[in-house]
Structures are given as C-alpha cells and as structure tokens.
Amino acid sequence: MFENLTDRLERSFKILKGEGKITELNVAATLKDVRRALLDADVNYKVAKEFTDTVKDKAIGMNVLTAIKPGQLMVKIVHDELAKLMGGEASELHLSGKPAIVLMSGLQGSGKTTFSGKLANMLKKKQHKNPLLVACDVYRPAAIDQLKVVGESIGVPVYSEPDNKNVNEIADHAIQEAKANGHDVVIIDTAGRLAVDEQMMNEISSLKEHVCPDETLFVVDSMTGQDAVNTAKEFNDRLDFDGVVLTKLDGDTRGGAALSIRTVVTKPIKFIGTGEKMEAIDVFHPERMADRILGMGDVVSLVERAQEQFDEEEAKRLQKKIQKNKFDFNDFLKQIEQIKKMGNIKDLASMIPGVGKAIKDIDIDNNAFNGIEAIIRSMTPKERTNPEVLNQSRKLRIAKGSGTSIQEVNRLVKQFDQTRKMMKMVTGSGMKQMMRNMPKMK
C-alpha cells in the first residue's frame, strides 16, 4: 500500500541529511521534491501545492532543538499535515434510525456489493447488530445473485424482489421486513451509475429522499486515482453523501485518491477495503495512514486485526497445550487459518515499523501457506496430534498426497519442532529457567 509514495518521500527527506538547521533554501529543495512525489502519486495539483506551502510555512524559521535533526523535524511536520489532509481523525457511522439505513452509491465495478457485505459482517461481529442487505440494483442480471452469495457467506439475510423495477418500493418493503424481523440496520446496495447519467442520478436522489438514510456512502476504487476524486466530487454535488469508502487500497501503490479526496470533496473517508475477504475492511484512521505512508508502520491496526481473530478462551486453551508440550499440527493449521483471515500477509508485514521497506521487493502473498496447509491436510488425524510418529514412509505418503516433495515435508516438520520448543520456552517454566541461566547484572 502506497509503496511508491513512501519510497519517494524517504528520498526527499534525505536532502536534509547532514544539514545543521532548517533554512529557506534546504526546505525549498526538500519540498520541491515532496511536491513532485505527491504529483507522481496522482495527488490533485492544488492539494499538493497547498500541502507543501503549509509545510514550508511551519518549517521555515522554526528553532530546532539540538536533539532534533532537521530531517526528523521535517518528517514530523509532514506527518502531522498528512494526517490533517486526510481528515485528522476517524469518522464514525451514525446509526440512530430504527432501523438505521445505509445507502450505497458509486460507479459500476467500484466494489459496492462486496463492501455492503463487508460492512454488514463488521456491524454484525463488532457491534452485535442484526443487519439486512437489500438488493436495489434492478439493472444488472446477476446483481441479486451476487448479493445473495455475499449474504450467505456471512450469515446475513438478503431482501430482493426480482420482478420489481421500482427501487423506492423495494426499499419500502425491505424496511417493513426489517422492522417485522428485528433487523436494526438496513444496507441498501444500488446499481452502479455515472454522474452524467441524468436518469440514473435522479433515481438514486429520489431513493435517498424517499428512505432518508442515516448514512449515504460513496464507494470508489482507489486505484483510479484522480478519476476517483473527480467522480466523488460529481456525485457529491448531486447526492450530498456523508462519507467515502476507498476500495482496493491494498493494491494502490500511489495513494492519490486517499490524499486528495477529503480536501476536494470536503467529506470524510470512513472506510477502506484492503482485500477480497469479508474481513478485509478497516475504519479509516488518518493518523495511522500517515504513519504507514512515512514508513512508520501501523502497530495499532495490526493488534486490532489480531484481536478480531484470536479470542481469549482459545488463547488460554492453546497456552495450556503449549505448556504441556501438546501443541500439534491441528493447532498449527488453525493458527495459519486465523493469520490468513487477518488479511494480505505483505500488507500485515508493512504494519510493523521498518519491515515494509525490507520486504517491498519480495513477492509475498497468502499463497505461501498453501504448501504448508496441503502437507498438514494430507496427514492422518493420528499424525496431526502425534507428530512423533512421522517416520520416513509416512512422510513419503504425505508428500505424494500433498503434491510436495519429501524435502518440503521434512522442512515443515523441522520448523514445527523448533516452533513448539520455542513456544514452550516462552510460555512455561522454560522462560523462568532461561532467566535463571542468564548472567546476573553487575
């Protein structure tokens, strides 16, 4: 995410390396490079100019403390201004209606249907809501089926009327259905449309006026850069939406939309999509995004994702197994599955300070786990729970069954043994023993 921009900004800050203090001359040289980096990232020209002018005003003439190098101060100023540029603080959904209504809008192919499912899933799991998805795309033949597939995957019901082309009526009936069945949030998925399509824009404007949604969200593909910003402005002029959802942000190496949209549209970015899975949705935090853009990582978001996947009871159960040296391949497989649910591995690694830069040229994705999973799934229940029984003939059978080599099976078994020993060392009495064996501080 935003790798190109991160690299360019790092190079820009190197201009100040070795400088004793901030001067108008070295600030101008640095910010000229910063502005060029922003423009190359497809940031709106006016936004880039205003941003660098603000940073320049704050930096010039500032008395730098002897402990703070000019480069470090510039990073701090740029960080704070980036966070402000993207909204300053997270903007929450306001769901006060009974039921609360969320209306989706955007171009075709922007990811509205998938995001509708992600939002329903998040509200269900994190806020214990009982959402209802509503299919109001009456034009695309497969739209209703797509939403139903999404709904089934997360256990959320979908309301649809395949033979009705009146979206206002469908929404009315869906709200009645929600009230009758205790659904406290209604998420209305609509057809994709262009802002210049008068008939389609009139339809969604009428729908908004008819249902009076608590939130109207504009969903846009972040990888379209400035086009995303321009489209958002056109939609906002007609629809006056409440917030923006940036999808496919995990594949966006530039970041122009995220950095420009708040200033141009004057509406907050509320959510970001970071992958294809239903769990790949984050509340947008400008401060954290500024951290990531400047290569500082985002440990808070990483911990939050981990907490969503690992519950306390499971952690206690696992700890007991580790202490008794009973950690087995079933547990190992479960850990892999939970890590995969957290999102793209490279994206997760980039949240750890310093790691993103180290792995930027390495091709890492969740497919790296496929071989490990295939090997474990090719084991018998006895072999999974008792790894000690894995002799050469068993390993050969597992290699054939998993489509891997005997060397790969041996490597996994060796890594598993090392992991098990290390886990026992840090969770049980082994850690106390290690501490006792360490030389005393003099």
Segments and roles (model prediction):
Residues S110, Y139-P141, K165-V167, G192-V196, ...:
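Short, small-residue-enriched loops and turns at beta-alpha junctions
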Residues K126-L132, I154-V158, D184-V186, V211-T216, ...:
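Short, surface-exposed connector motifs at secondary-structure boundaries
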Residues L16, D42, V78, L107, ...:
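Residue-level signature of catalytic and energy-coupling elements of molecular machines
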Residues R8-C136, A143-N164, I170-T190:
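Primarily NTPase-proximal linker/entry elements flanking Walker-type ATP/GTP-binding cores
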Residues F2-E19, R288-K442:
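Long amphipathic alpha-helical segments used for membrane anchoring, targeting, substrate engagement
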Residues A171-I175, K179, H183, A195, ...:
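Conserved phosphate-handling catalytic cores of large alpha/beta enzymes
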Residues P141-L147, A228-T231:
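Short, glycine/polar-rich helix-capping loops at beta-to-alpha or helix-loop-helix junctions
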